[in-house]
């Protein structure tokens, strides 16, 4: 399975009865790098504002103390505050690991359990395995590409199984969809 959907290995015959996939959340390297860059930028703008106000260079590069506090220093301060607020939001989402969870398919109990971590609580959906009608693969290329694996469930909207973010490679998406459809003994739609 991919890094997005990772099968948890089970011992013996239990692997034929149960499939568990972990789903990667917000705690990805790309999000952490973005949070670091935004934090450094926000601190830089804030220190530039303070340097302009105090008349002393607080940054090792440039000479921000020569900037006039009104209007350049104030604008730098606003950019710095906005950057630090955005950075704190990103770090909070990384700490929460928003969107992380698991997909559990249990033939023995006949249940499917989908769990995801939300902003303030764990979001969970349970339904009978017999209600799953198909595994759906959605592919859309272009400016905003979409590669999604979802379950078609009777009486519900399609339930997405893959993470939001960078699209999976097409071959991996097809392989994951085929393995899941084979395990659930349902059709694979969308290809």
From Swiss-Prot:
Q: Where in the cell is it found?
A: Cellular thylakoid membrane
Keyword Transmembrane listed = yes
GO cellular component labels: photosystem I; plasma membrane-derived thylakoid membrane
User: What domain of life does the UniProt record list for this protein's source?
Assistant: Bacteria
InterPro entries, alphabetized: PSI_Ycf4_assembly
The alphabetized list of GO BP terms reads: photosynthesis
Q: Main location per UniProt?
A: membrane
| TM ranges | 33-55, 70-92
Give membrane topology per the record: Multi-pass membrane protein
Cystine residue pairs:
none
Q: Which UniProt keywords apply?
A: Membrane, Photosynthesis, Thylakoid, Transmembrane, Transmembrane helix
The record's similarity note reads: Belongs to the Ycf4 family.
Q: Function of this protein? A: Seems to be required for the assembly of the photosystem I complex.
Mind telling me what this protein is named?
Answer: Photosystem I assembly protein Ycf4
In which organism is this protein found? Prochlorococcus marinus (strain MIT 9313)
Lineage of the native species? Bacteria, Bacillati, Cyanobacteriota, Cyanophyceae, Synechococcales
């Amino acid at each position: 399975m991919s890094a997005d959907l990772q099968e948890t290995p089970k011992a013996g015959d239990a692997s034929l009865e149960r499939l568990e996939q972990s789903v990667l959340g917000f705690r990805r390297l790309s999000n952490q790098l973005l949070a670091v860059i935004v934090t450094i930028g926000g601190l830089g703008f804030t220190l530039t504002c303070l340097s302009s106000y105090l008349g002393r260079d607080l940054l090792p590069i440039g000479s921000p103390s020569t900037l006039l506090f009104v209007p350049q220093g104030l604008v730098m301060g606003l950019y710095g505050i906005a950057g630090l607020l955005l950075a704190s939001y990103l770090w909070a989402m990384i700490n929460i690991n928003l969107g992380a969870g698991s997909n559990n398919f249990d033939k023995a109990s006949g249940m499917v359990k989908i769990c995801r971590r939300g902003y303030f609580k764990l979001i969970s959906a349970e339904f009978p395995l017999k209600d799953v009608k198909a595994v759906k693969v959605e592919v859309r290329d272009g400016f905003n590409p979409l590669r999604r694996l979802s379950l078609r469930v009777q009486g519900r909207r399609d339930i997405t199984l893959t993470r939001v973010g960078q699209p999976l490679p097409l071959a991996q998406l097809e392989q994951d969809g085929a393995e899941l459809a084979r395990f659930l003994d349902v059709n694979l739609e969308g290809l």
